[in-house]
Amino acid sequence: LSLVVPLALGVILAGCTSEPVMQDGIRVNDPFESGNRRIHAFNKGFDQRVVAPVARRVSAGGNEAGEPGAMDLVINAGANLSLPGKVVNSLLQGRPEPAIRNFFRFAVNTTLGMGGLLDPAGTDFGLPEVDTDFGETLAVWGVPEGAYLELPVLGPSTQRDAAGKVVDLLIDPVYHLLHRDAAWAAFGLRAASKAGDRARFGDTVDSVLQDSADSYAQLRLIYLMHRRHELNQGGTEIDPYADAAADDVIDPYDP
């Protein structure tokens, strides 16, 4: 964790360099908007040309017999590999209960769920995943949110969460315990699971990215409100994957 302090300090200093504004009832700190919009344009093109087609192929691997399809297996395996890192973060936050739940979920799915391809922990033992990350750990430690960022390929974030993504890679037990090739394979599987998520919520993601009057502002609004609610730091809960018609998507610039 030797990098945590300088990273967190950088977030604090950078987050104090601009004055947030109120937009649609929430505080928005976006001093890098022009650069963020350029990255957003790249991300939209990348999603349209690469991610969405892959997601559609993954989705096509499903079946109608109630059995898990390729999409479900990929999502399950990727989510299972993320659990050791969540255990570490819960412990760093001083929250032993979710750490224990995620540990047992990982143990059950790895042993009884064919290495995590299946989810007996959730379906048979009532052990749902308790989601967390190092961005939340920084929030628990009192590090401010910082400015809004859109990251290449990864999408919406903040300075605090961006720093958290870097540290999550550094502290993840999976990458320390596995051989280099196996660790890269695990990373690829987790990335593929994101394509599975994209397939599962494809219509709604398309409505936000392709049908919004201002998809950058719309995505920023959804992310900030959802993330702050998730961290109990204010903001109304918005499920970015809730079923909604394109006409119902909020345009934050609509008077």
Locations of regions flagged by a protein language model:
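Mid-length scaffold segments of soluble, non-membrane domains
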Residues: 76-159
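Bacterial Sec signal peptide processing site at the extreme N-terminus
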Residues: 11-34
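Active-site flanking loop/helix segments enriched in acidic
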Residues: 61-73
